[in-house]
C-alpha cells in the first residue's frame, strides 16, 4: 500500500486533500433538534462580513504566560482522544503531560462548529478568552477565524515536527503554510448501513448509490448529518455537481439540492438530521442507513463487537475535510499549545492516536509507525487512504461570507421543515 502522505499536492485541498480530483463514542455532536437549528439560523443572521484575504491586524494576541504557567486548556470534540481499556485514562495525553510538565485540562465541549462559534462570537470578535487555549474547529470555520483575525499566528520554531505535516494538507487558500492552523484529523463523509436490517428490508446486500437511501422500504429509517457540507455535499455529488467548483456548485445549484432534501424530508424519506448522536439511533435500530462520518462507523462496529455496519463512498463520491488545531486570540498559553501540537506530530504518537480515533492522520511517518503497531490498522483505507481511494473524495468549496450566511439559513430551514 502506498503511503498516503506522499500524495501529490493540488491547490484545492484548501481544506484537506486537493489532489482529490477537483471534480472533487466519537468526534462530533452537531446541531440536534429545533434548538440547534435555531442556533444555526441565528449564527447565519449575524455572520461577519469579510473576504478571503489575509487576517485582520486589529486584534492583539493575549500575553503568553506559558513560561511561568505550565498549564493548557484544550477544548476538543467528544470521543476524539485515545482511551485506555478501562476508559479511565488517555494514554497519549497523559504521556505528554509527564514528558512536558504541562498540565492539560482536556474538555470535550466542542459539540458543533456553528454552536461553538455562536456561543463564543462576541469573545472572538473582541479577542477575549473563550475558555480554552486550544480548539479544533473544522476547516471551513477555521478559515473564517483566520480571515477575521481571531486566532493567533503560531511560532513554527516551537514545533520541530511541523515539518511532518503531509504535503497534501499544505497550500490551503486561507493558511498556505499552516502558520495559524495545523491539521488534527481528516474526516470522510459517506454512507453507512446496518448490514442485517438493510438486507432484511430491501432484499439487497448493501446500498450502492445515494439514491438507494430513498427506497420506500427505508422510509423513516434514514438519517443525514446536520453538518451541511457533508450531507449536502454527498447528495450534490450524486447529482453530478462538482462541489469543489464555484462555477459548478453555484448558489442556484445549492438551492436545488436544498429543495430536493426538503422534499425528501417532507415525504419521510429522511427521519432526522443529527450529529454523532446518530450512533445511538443505529445502535437501537432506529436508523438503518444514512450519510455519516467514517470514523464513527469503525467505533460503532467496535461497540457492537462485530462488523454490524458497512461504510462506503458511492461511485459519485464522498466528502473530505479536516479538523485543525488553532489558538484563539485571547488564549494565554500559546507556547504550551505549540508543545502539544508538536507532540502529536511525532509519528509514534500520531499512529497511537489514529489507532483509537479511526480518522485520517495527517502526519508524515504515522503510516510506517502504524505498521509496527498494528499491520491490519495500517491497511485500513479509512485511516490511511491511498491515492485511488482519495480520488473519490471531494472537498466542499470555500464560501464567501455572503454565501455562508445564505447557505446556513437555507440549511437551517430545511431541518426545521420550513
Predicted regions and their residues:
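N-terminal secretory signal peptides
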Residues: 1-25, 36-41
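Ligand-binding pocket segment of bilobal, Venus flytrap-like solute-binding proteins
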Residues: 221-227, 231, 235-239, 244-312
Amino acid at each position: 500500500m502506498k503511503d498516503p502522505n506522499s500524495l501529490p499536492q493540488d491547490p484545492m485541498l484548501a481544506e484537506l486533500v486537493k489532489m482529490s480530483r477537483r471534480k472533487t463514542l466519537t468526534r462530533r455532536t452537531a446541531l440536534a433538534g429545533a434548538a440547534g437549528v435555531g442556533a444555526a439560523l441565528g449564527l447565519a443572521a449575524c455572520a461577519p462580513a469579510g473576504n478571503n484575504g489575509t487576517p485582520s491586524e486589529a486584534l492583539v494576541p493575549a500575553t503568553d504566560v506559558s513560561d511561568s504557567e505550565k498549564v493548557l486548556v484544550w477544548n476538543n470534540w467528544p470521543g476524539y482522544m485515545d482511551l485506555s481499556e478501562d476508559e479511565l485514562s488517555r494514554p497519549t495525553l497523559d504521556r505528554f503531560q509527564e514528558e512536558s510538565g504541562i498540565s492539560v485540562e482536556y474538555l470535550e465541549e466542542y459539540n458543533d462548529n456553528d454552536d461553538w462559534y455562536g456561543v463564543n462570537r462576541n469573545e472572538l470578535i473582541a479577542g477575549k478568552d473563550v475558555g480554552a487555549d486550544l480548539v479544533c474547529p473544522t476547516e471551513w470555520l477555521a478559515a473564517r477565524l483566520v480571515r477575521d483575525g481571531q486566532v493567533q499566528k503560531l511560532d513554527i520554531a516551537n514545533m520541530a515536527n511541523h515539518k511532518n505535516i503531509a504535503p497534501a494538507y499544505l497550500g490551503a487558500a486561507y493558511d498556505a503554510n499552516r502558520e495559524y492552523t495545523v491539521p488534527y484529523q481528516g474526516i470522510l463523509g459517506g454512507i453507512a448501513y446496518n448490514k442485517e436490517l438493510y438486507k432484511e428490508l430491501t432484499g439487497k446486500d448493501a446500498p450502492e448509490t445515494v439514491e438507494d437511501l430513498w427506497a420506500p422500504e427505508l422510509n423513516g429509517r434514514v438519517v443525514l448529518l446536520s453538518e451541511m457540507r457533508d450531507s449536502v455535499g454527498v447528495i450534490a455529488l450524486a447529482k453530478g455537481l462538482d462541489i469543489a467548483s464555484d462555477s459548478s456548485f453555484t448558489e442556484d445549484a445549492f438551492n436545488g439540492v436544498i429543495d430536493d432534501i426538503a422534499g425528501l424530508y417532507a415525504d419521510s424519506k429522511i427521519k432526522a438530521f443529527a450529529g454523532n448522536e446518530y450512533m445511538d439511533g443505529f445502535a437501537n435500530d432506529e436508523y438503518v442507513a444514512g450519510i455519516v462520518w467514517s470514523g464513527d462507523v469503525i467505533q460503532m462496529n467496535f461497540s457492537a463487537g462485530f462488523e454490524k455496519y458497512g461504510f462506503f463512498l458511492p461511485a459519485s463520491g464522498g466528502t473530505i475535510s479536516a479538523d485543525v488545531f488553532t489558538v484563539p486570540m485571547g488564549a494565554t498559553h500559546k507556547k504550551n499549545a505549540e508543545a502539544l501540537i508538536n507532540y502529536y506530530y511525532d509519528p509514534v504518537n500520531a499512529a497511537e492516536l489514529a489507532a483509537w480515533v479511526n480518522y485520517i492522520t495527517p502526519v508524515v511517518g504515522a503510516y510506517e509507525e502504524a505498521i509496527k503497531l498494528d499491520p491490519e490498522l495500517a491497511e485500513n483505507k479509512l485511516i490511511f487512504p491511498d491515492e485511488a481511494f482519495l480520488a473519490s473524495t471531494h472537498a466542499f468549496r470555500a464560501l464567501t461570507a455572503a454565501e455562508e450566511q445564505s447557505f446556513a439559513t437555507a440549511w437551517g430551514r430545511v431541518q426545521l421543515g420550513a
